Amino acid sequence: MAAKDVKFGSDARVKMLRGVNILADAVKVTLGPKGRNVVLDKSFGAPAITKDGVSVAREIELEDKFENMGAQMVKEVASKANDAAGDGTTTATVLAQSIVTEGLKAVAAGMNPMDLKRGIDKAVVAAVAELKKLSVPCSDSISIAQVGTISANSDETVGKLIAEAMDKVGKEGVITVEEGTGLEDELDVVEGMQFDRGYLSPYFINKPENGSVELENPYILLVDKKISNIRELLPVLEGVAKASKPLLIVAEDVEGEALATLVVNTMRGIVKVAAVKAPGFGDRRKAMLHDIAVLTNGNVISEEIGLELEKATLEDLGQAKRIVINKDTTTIIDGVGEEDAIKGRVSQINQQIKESTSDYDREKLQERVAKLAGGVAVIKVGAATEVEMKEKRARVDDALHATRAAVEEGVVAGGGVALVRVAAAIVGLKGDNEDQNVGIRVAMRAMEAPLRQIVDNSGEEPSVIANSVKAGEGNYGYNATTEQYGDMIAMGILDPTKVTRSALQFAASIAGLMITTECMITDLPKDDKADLGAAGGMGGMGGMGGMM
């Protein structure tokens, strides 16, 4: 076992604080509308340029192991805030730095670290309750666009695109961000349920101008097995032919004689049919077939539940207004499924999302919810260069997370104002003893730090503006973009309540642990010279040749 280096008390805390400050100072320059860029060196390709706090934090590893421990603990604050709300990472880092700095000063002055932590925790609980009182619901497109704009570093086009996407696919719908091919940002909306499976034969194509199959008011046959024998399909095909409607077959696979017969019937115009493979694999395929069944008010023909393909009737088939199939995708538009059944299926999948422990499974389940709930929107980010594209995509991702958080828990005044108002509201809070009162004051002082940093980054004097904001009431604050005072919500400067709350809670949690640290242990660096000397001693083995 390697020898360890151990530091105690103030020696440990000074090193840890140095690491905290290095990471926080690198991250906090990005805060606010006039935040600066940080350039990150990459092992290959062009350097990355970012204004995203968590991207900066993730890059930092320090040479001194004790300093690095401090930096990594603050990195955890940024990561946790990012995971919980998708934004607010820089705010969380600034809060954590302030609490740690002020808290360690109090420890050095002889305060009890445990009581300090209890005081900080009390202040945060009271502050979160006050934040909820200040919160305003965020449901209309204008406020959603404003939140998106602020989170994308005052880029109005991004805010408008996100609001438009939410209008089209609903608050629960899936919105994804991709790298586009042009210079402009674009929004691409797929209505209805789309899955990644195309036609099984190009002979099904009935719209040669765009190489697609379009079926109007079709029946939909869902089968949980391979179909290779046409005899199994005949009863369904005869029923559909009598009804004079087209048919879409979704099965594990359609092959051989069955596929050939379907193609011949389609080309002769006897029955208009198209066949596609079912989406997904294994259990996920079964689940997605059931989703399609609920959406189209049909049944999945599966021998597991005693339904045989030969005995299937028109009542077992689903229906939709329109289906469009191309080489790679199938889109079912306006399925005739009952609304209550669809809602029940969505809530069932939402329950699975809550219970899921795998990020991949959770993502796939969320995709299924979106497909049932209303559609998928894709924001395609445009930029002139690859470096700009990557930076912009990260900002759009942040903005999307922030708007989701705003819809979930509402919004508060932005620009650091909400935390200043919260600190003023809990000014009468008292702890069980004087050390706890100091902890409460440490937390309250930290709540001013984001406002001060935003002002500092904009090139103004933090103390002057912080005092002016504190003298005001309600949503009165400082707009760093226009350098004017006024009502922050009226000016469209909003922060999601969830983002502000998460930033404060995670910052206080990890900063509290750092204040109560008394000992730090790390591996001693290995002495490479000693290792080389030991290896050099093996040279004498060459003399063993004489043993022969």
Curated annotation (Swiss-Prot):
Q: Name one GO biological process term.
A: protein refolding
Provide any one GO MF term from the record.
Answer: ATP-dependent protein folding chaperone
Is the Chaperone keyword given for this protein? yes
- Using the UniProt record, name the top-level EC class of this enzyme in a single word: isomerase
What domain of life is recorded for the organism?
Bacteria
Database matches in InterPro entries: Chaperonin_Cpn60_CS, Cpn60/GroEL, Cpn60/GroEL/TCP-1, GroEL-like_apical_dom_sf, GROEL-like_equatorial_sf, TCP-1-like_intermed_sf
Q: Does the keyword Isomerase apply?
A: yes
Quote the subcellular location field of this record: Cytoplasm
Q: Which GO terms describe its cellular component?
A: cytoplasm
Q: Which NCBIfam families match?
A: GroEL (TIGR02348), PRK00013.1 (NF000592), PRK12849.1 (NF009487), PRK12850.1 (NF009488), PRK12851.1 (NF009489)
- Which family does the record assign? Belongs to the chaperonin (HSP60) family.
Q: Subunit structure, per the record? A: Forms a cylinder of 14 subunits composed of two heptameric rings stacked back-to-back. Interacts with the co-chaperonin GroES.
Q: What is this protein called?
A: Chaperonin GroEL
Species whose genome carries this gene = Photorhabdus laumondii subsp. laumondii (strain DSM 15139 / CIP 105565 / TT01) (Photorhabdus luminescens subsp. laumondii)
Q: What is the lineage of its organism?
A: Bacteria, Pseudomonadati, Pseudomonadota, Gammaproteobacteria, Enterobacterales
- Tell me the gene name: groEL
